[in-house]
Amino acid sequence: TVLVMQALQKKGNKALFVGGCVRNSLLKMPVTDIDIATDAKPHEIVSLAIDSGLKSIPTGIEHGTITIVSNNKTYEVTCFRKDIKTDGRHAVIEYSDDIEDDAKRRDFTMNAIYSTSSGIIVDPLEGLKDLKIRHVRFIKDPNKRIVEDYLRILRFFRFTSEYGDPNLGIDADGLAACAANIDGIKLLAKERIGAELKKILKTKNPSIVLAAMDRAGILSNILPGSSSKYVPILIHQENQNTINWITRLVVLGGAEPTKSLRLSNKESREYKYTLKAINLGKKPSVVAFEFGKDIALSYSLSLAALTETFLPDNLYDQIILGTSVKFPIEAKDLKNLQGKKLGDALRELKDLWIKSEFTLSKKDLLKNR
């Protein structure tokens, strides 16, 4: 980090940390990505990196962003800039020497706080005041910020869930602007919508923001037929279990989220198996045997939330049982059968064994043949 900052400031340019790394440092939360803003232009950033023996990658050079690699760690370095034209998805930018121009084009006040390499805070838009009370607020006019990129509607709810103070509630101006610009969501790629909803569902307790999204018509816009009603019940049931956003998505419901949110093959499989298990309504031990422990837990939590009932007391014993048993019959045990008849017989015996809650032995099962 020191090497990168020294390289950028080598010829008198300004370089400041900005965004998530500053916000999370001040909140004493983990920092993952490091973003740096500078008054150097793209070609100067590349030149300064080369002069200091650092690798540079032109990841978003047309938008003024260069990735610098130092000690196998990446740093996103972006020029001070201002938006000249936006279409709700992309922006035409112009470089600037003024940090305030750069701050004004960001989304929320808490994301427009800068820091020097020595830790001096530069706060052109008084974002620190909002950060201290955990108030997630758009910069200046919320409508203008949203029209610049409609994904900011979903980001507003995600940031409120992740960083907002629940006692403060949701910023009223921001919420009204999100509801007023709801049609803009249709302009966004499904992948972007899916990625942002996934992040919302991964926050510790998204109940409040999902209920607000539901009331504002935003949830039904991205997931027709969905409802936030059962999410608080699920979150209460989750208790000490690891948060699984797919389970929360199952409880939200809605038409074909695997397509409307562009889920990966792995995510789609997990979603469909959990839903299939709910529709079959089998015991957790059977679901664990057929689909594995993760699906069994997801199924049990979803079912308890949707039916507003408690989890079975012996849930974990059932899941352990289902994942540890092995069907005792193999094809070689039915030597007199072949092809379709063999397949049918194996299925029939397996159903019988499952119905016995895995108690029938090989000998017992073969007696039925």
Regions found by a protein language model. Name each.
Residues 1-369:
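Catalytic cores of the polymerase beta-like nucleotidyltransferase superfamily
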